[in-house]
Design a protein with these regions (language model features):
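Membrane-interfacial terminal anchoring regions of lipid-handling membrane enzymes
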Residues: 1-104, 111-113, 118, 135-137, ...
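Short, basic, glycine/proline-bearing loop/turn elements
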Residues: 128-135
Length: 459
């Protein structure tokens, strides 16, 4: 994250989408090379692409508007979807004799915070690709209006991650946010007001990563690094496998929990489950889950107490509120006119920004674990689940150490499978949605629930 985050600044500006067809052409030409050189991905395949081909045909004929609701386990997901658009959809369309207008693309909705930690150039790239940003944790009416307008009137379909962010787990879907469903109903409303009879659809898309060759040795080496960093003795396994590495992973997780529990009880005067209470839980995984839940709640409380926020809702909702509160302390309305601010006021503002960033650090730790359970590996002990869990622990340690590295270690070459699901019709549900506010809320909830089940079925 850039050092500028520690200084008080004017409010975050909206980055308007400014689609540049020439820039998209360059990106699509370079994309396969970029994926080969900059990611661990060696193969991308897709299932039910013909469904997407037909949807694009209908979209281009003016019959439908649709949004792709895609799984978001990793930051590589947009590259995979862009490959689907630029390579796989045109290929399948040609094989089926379907004429599509090129380019095949989508207007992505992305988190406005990404350019803050990934670099301002990312905002420029996203804008020129026709993407539109939104701020999490608040009613970002400017961002919502932009997304709503693109859904109804954009040159391309929409694409968004209903989970709201990455969770690092290919086979565990976070609880979906209702925004995708709400945008769908708004689109249906806008089309009706404009006298347009296009159908509105939401299309679930699954993305799943797997290793070409099981990287047990790389996982073992990473475990050794994490053990050394956390003060545990390093005892490399002679033969790396789930049987030999799982006890080490459990021991590492328990040790890290102990360190963090001491950190919060000693220096932040928080109360956590005592050893006697935990000792009564016979199963190690269950004990870990209980301790982790208590620790995550405590870490968020530290942030919430500073920003005077109520501790309500899911962990993800609480994280987003903390993030928005932190941004409000850093990106301030009263700093719009920097020239009119005295040196003392600026220095005080920087102090507030620095403290806000420090308090947000606790929330960043929690963010990595919002979808983690104590049984993810045990219920299906694959190398993918083991690697994902180990990488989450790596991310936690990296945040504690203050490492600036954005990218996770690459443990081995991966292949990606994208699955296009059955479209969910918003237009069919719109008459019931129109009834009253209660019916509208119920309609959004039902679509969100159906989308959740559909995406879980694509794993």
């Amino acid at each position: 994250m850039a050092d500028v985050i520690y200084q008080a600044q004017p409010p975050l500006e909206f980055i308007p989408p400014a689609f540049n067809p020439l820039f998209l052409r360059v990106v699509q030409l370079l994309l396969p090379t970029y994926i080969n050189w900059q990611t661990a991905i060696t193969q991308i395949e897709a299932e039910n692409v013909e469904v997407l081909v037909d949807l694009y045909r209908q979209f281009q004929e003016g019959k439908i508007r649709f949004m792709l609701a895609f799984r978001h386990p990793k930051t590589d997901d947009p590259f995979c979807l862009s490959y689907l658009f630029s390579q796989l959809v045109p290929k399948v369309a040609r094989s089926h004799g379907t004429m599509l207008q090129l380019p095949i693309h989508a207007h992505f909705i992305y988190d406005r915070g990404i350019p803050l930690w990934a670099g301002s150039y990312v905002g420029w790239i996203a804008s020129n690709l026709g993407a539109t940003p939104i701020q999490r944790g608040k009613a970002d009416w400017t961002g919502l209006r932009s997304a709503r307008n693109l859904f109804a009137n954009g040159k391309f379909p929409m694409a968004a991650a209903p989970e709201g962010g990455t969770n690092g787990l290919s086979e565990n879907i976070s609880t979906l946010e209702p925004g995708i469903a709400q945008l769908g109903f708004w689109c249906a409303e806008d089309l009706q007001k404009a006298g347009r009879d296009q159908q509105v659809l939401i299309v679930p898309v699954g993305i799943k990563y797997s290793y070409v060759d099981a990287p047990w040795d790389a996982i073992a080496n990473l475990l050794s690094e994490l053990e050394a960093a956390s003060g545990l003795p390093v005892n490399p396994s002679e033969f790396a496998s789930v049987e030999s590495l799982y006890p080490r992973l459990l021991t590492l997780a328990e040790h890290l929990l102990s360190l963090m529990e001491q950190f919060y009880t000693r220096f932040y005067h928080q109360k956590l489950p005592d050893a006697k209470t935990i000792g009564e839980i016979e199963d190690r995984n269950e004990a870990l889950a209980v301790r982790l839940k208590a620790l995550l709640n405590t870490a968020l409380l530290i942030s919430e107490q500073y920003f005077d926020l109520q501790s309500k809702g899911s962990l993800r909702d609480r994280c987003q509120r903390v993030e928005q509160a932190g941004w409000n302390y850093i990106f301030r309305e009263d700093f719009k006119d920097v020239k009119g601010i005295s040196a003392v006021e600026r220095a005080l503002g920087d102090r507030v920004a620095e403290e806000a960033n420090a308090r947000m650090w606790h929330m960043r730790l929690v963010e990595s674990f919002v979808a983690v359970s104590g049984n993810y590996i045990r219920e299906n002990p694959t190398v993918e689940r083991f690697a994902e869990t180990t990488l989450i622990l790596w991310q936690m340690i990296a945040k504690i150490k203050g490492d600036k590295a954005v990218r996770r270690p690459q443990l081995g070459k991966q292949k990606v499978k994208i699955t296009v699901g059955k479209p969910i019709s918003i237009s069919e549900r719109y008459p019931a949605y129109q009834g009253n506010r209660l019916a509208a809320r119920q309609g959004v909830a039902e679509v969100t629930n159906d989308l959740q089940h559909a995406m879980e079925g694509l794993i």
